[in-house]
Amino acid sequence: MMGNATKAIQDALDQVRVFDPHCHLRAARPWASNLADIVLYHHVWIELISSGMDQYAVTKAGMPHELRDPGIPPIERLRRSLPYLPHIRNTTAGLFLRWILQDLYGLPGDLNEQNLEQACRVVQERGQESSWSEHVLRDRCGIDASITVERAGRACPARMYRAREWAPFNIAGGKMAPHQVLASFEKQFGRAIRSVSDYEEYIASGIRKLGVENLRFLGLWLQPYVSPERSRPEDVDVVLRKATAKEPLSQAEIGGFCYFGMCRLLEELRQTPLRTIQVIVGAEVLPPHRSIPCWNGNFTGAIARIAGQFEDFRFNMSSASDHYTQDLGILAKHVPNISVAGYWWHTLYPFYIRKSIETRIDMVPMNKIVAFLSDAYHSEWCYPKLKMVKAVWGEVLSERVAKGWCDVGTAVDLIRSAFWDNPARIYGGS
């Protein structure tokens, strides 16, 4: 039987308004177009490949459908995935998929040849209902505001806001060599980037093109080895020369370039009204599309120095690597303009969600904790992620009240602050 404290906490979680400060929902059509959009979401897709499915079985490009048109009819993609779906029954992604099918659609959690076509019809019919996305986001999730980083589509509907992601300071990545990254910068810029002055003008022109006046935040995916070492203008000139010549760069050179570029970007942003920066760290995507967590000891000191240099900005941070759990908590504890948010990519699993919540409650003032960000591409995937996050929050808070570590009133205040008040204040929501 549920105790009074646990019931009060559960009631607060059931009733709280939720602000989702990072998603990839399409403004014109936030919901899934078909069942394949749901079943082959990239978190599921990569596990199916890892379990034995061919890289090109359900997408001709061998890439997630969020990045490339799969070029294969949805029903055929699903049929090809069926032999591999049983292999992920144990994973959190597999559980999330079952929750979507069962809770939102009333379908069996396990798809097979006998029920596949009916499941496809049900999803198609729901998607044709004008109120479907509103039902999922508002009624089932309680999400009253979202910020999408997707650029395509018409103006955002009510309660959906826009943001942009940009990383003009990452001169190398898991999929691209420095000369390839530099070429992509030059394509955006419209001319060669050969000197630090060229690079500074590239950043300035990029800020102008973004139209940041209409954005709720600028999202920055930082290299974990960002460092003030080798971040002088002359160091940037050396990096640009070596990248142009297709010469290898050291980690220190890449980290210094990143540090210089981020500082330069923030200086340019000071010419605009935008002061909210969303920082994500701890993931690198290797070819063909295999994301891994990554960590470097330089990051914590570098971001603390940047936050100190740019105290007029708000930095809301999330990580895909559990190694940053304590680091981000201590940053938010000690640095006034740094706060923490959600559980991104490789940390969106119950064990790591619990660890993050416990760490943040232990050390971060409650007005600097953001409980949730979906990172979802379709509204249906917001549902299981939020369901899990709320479940773990409920367990953690109930245990703390039972131990006498906090009272029920504090627990309820934490829920309201972390799920709505804090993200609404940080990101300017109503």
Model feature map: region roles:
Residues 227, 235-240, 260-263, 274-328, ...:
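Catalytic core of soluble alpha/beta enzymes
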Residues 3-271, 313, 329-430:
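Metal-cofactor-binding active-site regions of metalloenzymes
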